[in-house]
């Protein structure tokens, strides 16, 4: 089978500052949205020209230190009509901050910080391993959220394997307003693996260390997760987007047992 050819076109931006994510709104506008870790989102045209004012500025809410900051952006599949988009950031509450997943509403090339509706708040026990990516599933339209194991090193709380912790997970929620028009602003898809059993309803898969970035194959729906390793292996996990997958941390790092763990039932990278 012949492999397809891939080409790249250089995209030069002006005055980037800690850019951590880049996406589009899928609204036919051709706009490119660049996320800066300090708490701003800018719009660029396809020639690399930036708007004079940011699309969103929540720098006053964001803790920009180490791995923390504004980390993810996803546009609602119906953004062209409802103006909804979602962000993932670490706030300034407490010594290590909280992960916030929030919805905002855009009007034209701007979104007011006052339009924030907070969907999820996850306390962070340490100052690292925050995950941060968010995407809508191309086949189900649900919002997926990656979370790190809570930090330090070696997952001292074994949070990634715990089904009562949101850390070290891929979460999956339904943010359609029809599903739940009131707080908390989302509902649980009925086919989430722990929706009717022990474990947090929001969990889709688990056993992740710091899934800083993930994405979907838009055609097949397959899931690709980049998971930061402890000391010997980095991971790229590629699977069908199936419920309840255990990616192994902190029992496995890549293909290797971690710290003498001999568990089973893990999906290797």
Name what the model sees in each region.
Residues 1-154, 213-229, 267:
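Acidic, Gly/Ser/Thr-rich repeat motifs that build Ca2+-stabilized beta-propeller blades
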Residues 27, 35-38, 60, 68-70, ...:
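Beta-propeller domain segments
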